[in-house]
Amino acid sequence: MNNWQRILSVARRELRIIRNRPLYFMGSIGVIAFCAIFFLTFLDHGLPDDIPIGVVDEDYSTTSRNFCQQLDATQLGKVVHYNSFSSAREDMTSGKIAAVCVIPEGMNEDIQAFRQPKITFYVNGLYFVSGALAWKDLLTMVNLTNGAVQREVLRAKGYNDAQIMGMIRPIDIDTHQIGNVTTNYNYYLSGILLPGILEMIVILVLIYSLGAELKFGTSRHLMDTSGHSLVTALMGKLLVWTLAFAAIGFVIIMLLYHWLHFPINGSIFNMFIAMFLMIFASEAIGIFIIEMLPVPRLALSVGALYSVLGFSLSGFTLPLEAMPPYIQGLAAMFPIRHYYLFYVQEVIFGAGFAGWWREVIYLLIFLFVPLIGLNRLKKAYIHQNFPKE
């Protein structure tokens, strides 16, 4: 039996194992399908909308009612009226509303008398996104209300609208957003979250697949099937899993940039390259972890920790430049970081090969990492002298 036949024998053996253990299906296709449905529907509108904002109107004037109507008309906010601050505060602490706005009694009279009435905000900071968006919505409406009051006063003094706008807003802002032009959370986050989740799945599933041979005491049978060659055994297993993960990655890219029409300034085919390279690099990391820690439970724990850290250190939520210097260096150890940089250059800037060729080299370097511990894993497979839990 030649080497290729042994690889196919190992691959057929792996397919039988997958068929007999539904955990593999649920841990790969099931998880990524659930996450895709969850994130793509949760962020369907780009930003969370209709965030409940409690309003305690103690003034009951035309101005306060107009303020509430304008706040309710915004995309982000949905006004919930309360008769007292205590009931509004109780609902905010229980998470039913994201913020409370208290309009003081006599606000309209104070405005007419130029006594600067104070509108009080209370924002629930435990829910960062909803709290920040509610704060932004309230602040915007207060500024607009201030402008409306000043406009009416200046109109009464005989100024025309052009002069009034020059006084209310002497400096105009011309904003040009680079990258996420539409300010759409779905476009920006889902394009990284789903590949990041796939990286986690690749690492954990491969660790479990290799560690299960030790856990169930079947590693010697695997070595017999591969002709006592660990490289052949790994190639047989990777033949199955690489095709499976590549198919999942292909569907993710097609889903994002073809079926859902996420904006992309570069080529979708280049994103296929990025996805496949990230999958190969993640497989290499999974193999390396089980080589260094041939104890399934411990290896899975380390693999999960490594995968989660990848989300934090990839830089797509908090810029890497804002992190401590010693943390910035660690970011290069995560394939998702290089996928993110590839993504920025291709999807956002459309830079092409000139923008992401370095990331290709970095991802290819990961493929050599498993060479460090091949002998250690081979001895573990043959002697089975590590804990099986």
State the predicted function of each range.
Residues 4, 8-12, 187, 226-227, ...:
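Alpha-helical membrane-protein architecture signal
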Residues 190-209:
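Long, hydrophobic alpha-helical segments
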Residues 129-146, 179-194, 213-225, 245-253, ...:
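Hydrophobic alpha-helical transmembrane segments
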Residues 38, 60, 251-255, 263-389:
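Membrane-spanning alpha-helical segments of multipass transporters and channels
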Residues 228-255, 360, 364, 368:
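Selective transmembrane-helix segments that form parts of the transport pathway or gating/packing helices
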Residues 195-198, 243, 247, 277, ...:
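Residue-level hotspots within pore-lining transmembrane alpha-helices
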Residues 1-187, 380, 388-389:
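Extracytoplasmic/periplasmic domains immediately adjacent to an N-terminal transmembrane anchor
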Residues 205-243:
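Helix-loop-helix units of permease transmembrane domains in multi-pass membrane transporters
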